[in-house]
Amino acid sequence: MIFMILGRSKEFILKLPIWTQIITYIAILVYALSFFGISTGVLSLSWIGLLQKRQLYEIITYVTLHLSMLHIVFNFVSLLPAMSQFEKKQGTLACILVTVIPYTLFPGIMHLIVYHFFLRKDYVSIAGLSGWAFAFISASCVHSPQRLISFFNLFSIPAYCFPIIYLIMTTILVPKASFIGHASGAVMGYCTPFMLGSIPLKSWAQNVDPIFQSWVKNYHSFDQLSHAQLPIAEPLSTFSSFPGKGTRLGG
C-alpha cells in the first residue's frame, strides 16, 4: 500500500511543470533532512534571525520549511494544482518571477514588520508554502471574478470572494495559522495581473525560453494569448478544502 502511494506520488510529481516540480522536491528534501538529525529550523524567518543574526537567506528559505507531515501534505494539496496550472498557462519564467520575488518577499517582510513593530515578538518565525497557495488561488480567482465557486457544496460565492472566505476559515479552524502570511499571499495573488503587466515579460521570455525549452523537460514557454488573459487562461475547476497550516515556529 505504501509503495503504491509512493509510486503514484512520484508519477504525479514528474508530470508537474519544471518549476513546480523543483519546489516540490526541495520542500520534500528539507523535510526529510530533519529525520537525519539535521536542524532545519534555521531556514525559518524571524526578525532575530534575519536582522540580528544577519541570516539573510531566511527571507527566501522560509517557504521550503515545514514542521510536520500534515503541514507539508496540506500545503501541497492546496498549492500544487493552482501553481502548476499557472505555470502551464503563463510560462515557467513568469512563475519563477512571481514566486521568488512578490510571493516570497512580501509575506516575509510583512511578517517581520507586524511582529517587530506591533506585536513585539521578534522570536516568532514563519515557515511553509501556504502563503504561495493563497497567492496562486487568488491569482486564479482574479481571472474570472464573477464565476461562482461551490463552497463545500453548501452554497456558491463569486470567485473574487473565495480567497477571503478561505482566509477567514483557515484562521479560525487551523491552530497557529499565519494570518499575516496568508493574507499577504492573497494580496499578491490579487495583484498578479498588474505585476506581470508592468514588466517586459514577453521580451524576457523571447530571450530565455528558447534556451531552456530545448533541453529542460516540462519547461513551459511564455504564451502571449494566455498572458493577455492574466492571470491564467483557464479557471481552476476546483480548490482544495484545506489550505495548509501555515505554521509559525516558536509561537
Swiss-Prot record:
Changing S130A: Abolishes proteolytic cleavage of sre1 and sre2. Does not affect interaction with cdc48. Its EC number is 3.4.21.105. GO terms for molecular function: protein-macromolecule adaptor activity; serine-type endopeptidase activity. Disruption phenotype: Defective grow in response to low oxygen levels. Impaired cleavage of sre1 under hypoxic conditions and increased degradation of precursor protein via proteosome. In a dsc1 mutant background, results in defective proteolytic cleavage of sre1 but restores its precursor levels. It is an enzyme of class 3 (hydrolase). GO terms for biological process: proteolysis; SREBP signaling pathway. Changing G246R: Impairs interaction with cdc48. Results in defective growth in hypoxic conditions, lack of sre1 cleavage, and decreased levels of precursor sre1. It catalyses: Cleaves type-1 transmembrane domains using a catalytic dyad composed of serine and histidine that are contributed by different transmembrane domains. Keywords: Golgi apparatus, Hydrolase, Membrane, Protease, Serine protease, Transmembrane, Transmembrane helix. The keyword Kinase does not apply. One of its GO terms (cellular component) is Golgi membrane. Residues 225-251 are annotated as: SHP box. Residues 43-58, 115-122, 175-178 are lumenal. InterPro entries: Peptidase_S54_rhomboid_dom, Rhomboid-like_sf. Its main location: Golgi. Gene3D superfamilies: Rhomboid-like (1.20.1540.10). Residues 1-21, 80-93, 144-153, 200-251 are cytoplasmic. Belongs to the peptidase S54 family. Interacts (via C-terminal SHP box) with cdc48; the interaction is required for rbd2-mediated cleavage of sre1 and sre2. Rhomboid-type serine protease that catalyzes intramembrane proteolysis. Upon binding to cdc48, required for sterol regulatory element-binding protein sre1 activation by mediating its release from the membrane and thereby regulating its activity under hypoxic conditions. Upon binding to cdc48, required for the processing of sterol regulatory element-binding protein sre2. This is Rhomboid-type serine protease 2. It comes from Schizosaccharomyces pombe (strain 972 / ATCC 24843).
